[in-house]
């Protein structure tokens, strides 16, 4: 498990791995659904350096009444 940079939960799981061994991995937090790549800068991957303005409290995800829809794909 990996620590989520956005909500600090310890529930980050590997979603995908690079076809080139060790180049990168993609993680997803099972608490807040944030995704990040291992190759991104520490300001994204390191919970201590993640911008506090974008941090969320995991308890708030339980009461979130509206989740933004994924926009339609443009042709």
UniProtKB/Swiss-Prot annotation:
Induction: Up-regulated by salicylate via the transcriptional regulator BsdA.
Any GO BP annotation: response to toxic substance
Result of knocking out the encoding gene: A triple bsdB-bsdC-bsdD deletion mutant no longer converts vanillin to guaiacol, the conversion stops at vanillic acid.
Keywords: Aromatic hydrocarbons catabolism, Detoxification
Other information: It is not known, if phenolic acid decarboxylase forms a complex composed of BsdB, BsdC and BsdD. The term subunit is often used in reference to the operon, however there is no experimental evidence to prove the existence of the complex.
Known function: Involved in the non-oxidative decarboxylation and detoxification of phenolic derivatives under both aerobic and anaerobic conditions, however the precise biochemical function of BsdD in metabolism of phenolic acid is unknown.
Protein name in UniProt: Protein BsdD
Native source organism of the sequence: Bacillus subtilis (strain 168)
């Amino acid at each position: 498990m990996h620590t989520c940079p956005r909500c600090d939960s310890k529930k980050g799981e590997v979603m995908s791995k690079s076809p080139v061994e060790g180049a990168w991995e993609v993680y997803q937090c099972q608490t807040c659904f944030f995704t990040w790549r291992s190759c991104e800068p520490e300001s994204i991957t390191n919970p201590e350096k993640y911008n506090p303005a974008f941090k969320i409290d995991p308890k708030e995800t339980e009461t979130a009444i509206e989740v933004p829809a994924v926009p339609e794909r443009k042709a």
